Amino acid sequence: MTKRRGNSTDRPPRAGSSVAPAGQRVRRWAIPGLLAAAVLVAIGVLAFGGGTTASDPAGGTASVRPVLGKAEAPVLIREYGDFQCPSCGAFARLIEPQIRAAYIDTGKVRLEWHDFAWIGAESRDAANAARCAGDQGKFWEYHDLLYQSQSGENQGAFSKDRLKSFGAGLGLGTATFGACIDGGNHLAAVQADFADVSSKGFNGTPTFVIGTQRIVGAQPFEVFQAAIEAALATK
């Protein structure tokens, strides 16, 4: 089976309503042997609609679930993304700032990050590095920098040396951050997230879950706004 690299989707929704209009760019993946490996190393696979505040793989470094926003915010957005995914980058650069300003900064929404690192080794290394930055309180700053620095897939844009240089630019402790990247301290948590995503049947990045609605792709702000307002109306 090969990866489908088309830019649109017409597949039916699963597990609640799903938004993914034709013509919207979405990265899709197929299920190769990577899935079996991810399942073997993952623990605590969650059912659709479940949640967690931390991943703590056996024998690995405890990896706190990155969350942006106030803990008491009534609506939760779960984002499943890959740092090499162009559509994920488009969302992060163009749509997410609007959601932050309208809903996260105002205390109505919190955004929870889940790694869907499927495009290749640089996706997994970038996801690990972002969590390493999170160890020093700068996950979201590093998240933003990764998406601003996208340049091809598995072509060196997110080599370990470059990932370390990004951390230096953010003022992260060089020795600690570099050791975390080289040691793959959070790779088990990244793989656990991948197995969780696989168990839900998601096959496009980015994917979002807001209440009972699933949104696939870098949809216009108005699509997210409608889903958020619907979720707020139930609170």
How should these model regions be labeled?
Residues 66-68, 102, 197-199:
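Short, flexible, glycine/charge-rich loop motifs used to bind or transfer phosphoryl groups or to couple energy/partner
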Residues 67-68, 158, 215:
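Short clusters of hydrophobic/aromatic residues that line enzyme substrate/ligand-binding pockets
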